[in-house]
């Protein structure tokens, strides 16, 4: 029988983050995942400032991720065709990046191994039950496992929820549905810039192109399930989107798919979902921890993983009620507030006028562009004004993540510092900031 202080089920960002934090605090941690890494994961591959800061704190180095691409500017097109450039801050460090999950998650799991986590990838958990002051698991190819706590990072349809009998909404399908396809020979504006298109028929959803090294890009779109758009029509809608001139011109005439399109559901309901079942804490997609407005979830996954670890550390092995209380309070008190604000803003973006007004206001001048892009990329929490306990001194003007790594190279260009080509410079004319398409 395998014994541990904590067993983590799931090797994605939330599970690995929890495992790393626990191992560094001296806990004996085992991690199981049914997949063998590296493995692909359907995702937009974008990394917000908040996610980058957490990855840095947990020990992930960008140069360990082969497909890492620093982003220095974002372009947003409103339903009216107004396109605004939002340059990311030049205060040092990285504020946004793109990395394929097949590379990112494998590299992060290596960080967990280096921290002392015993990783069993390719081994599925087949049963789970709480027994007195332990949680008992049965794992394929490993056998029985017992731990004081379990961190469930096993995805939106968490099998552990079902095994423990705490499925709180049968038939749940998520708030978002997204489709992603990798493109190669991207030689247009999308080769270096990150693009978001708020086309009227997608609202409050959007289409995107996120740059990757070597003339490649993650291109896709996401829709809200509540918007009355049937998900079975997404592949046909995708073919139509790719023919739209304002998207085709950004990708470049030679851009072509290098892999099939893949679709996936996205959960975004952390404020109301069940976060704890006895000695089991749910994190990441299993906690439905995704931004309600954008569908982004990597930063939220890392945050829930760390919060779960800190709760276990603070509560100790014999006070599961305190662990549960601390974890729920921290999640609901911070991320719950972000979720409620994002849901409110999403209602504004459902309508063409609302989306058009949002882009107009955000791009009004240098000050609005500078502060909007920080907020958009989660340099600080969505609802930070309503949660003073999350304020920090340099919140509105501090540097990005990985500043020390950039300094060590002796260059101020983020992409070049990490071995990637720098983003193409934009002309210093009004058209570089705003242009109709």
Where are these regions (language model features)?
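Predominantly flavin-linked oxidoreductase catalytic cores and closely associated redox partners
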Residues: 111-251
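Beta1/beta-strand and adjacent pyrophosphate-binding region of the FAD-binding site
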Residues: 1-14
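Conserved Rossmann-like nucleotide-cofactor binding loop
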Residues: 14, 37, 157
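FAD/FMN-dependent oxidoreductases across multiple families
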Residues: 67, 227-312
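Conserved N-terminal glycine-rich FAD pyrophosphate-binding loop of Rossmann-like flavoproteins
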Residues: 36-56
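C-terminal helical "tail/cap" subdomain of flavin- and related membrane-associated enzymes
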Residues: 310-437
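Glycine-rich FAD pyrophosphate-binding loop
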Residues: 23-43
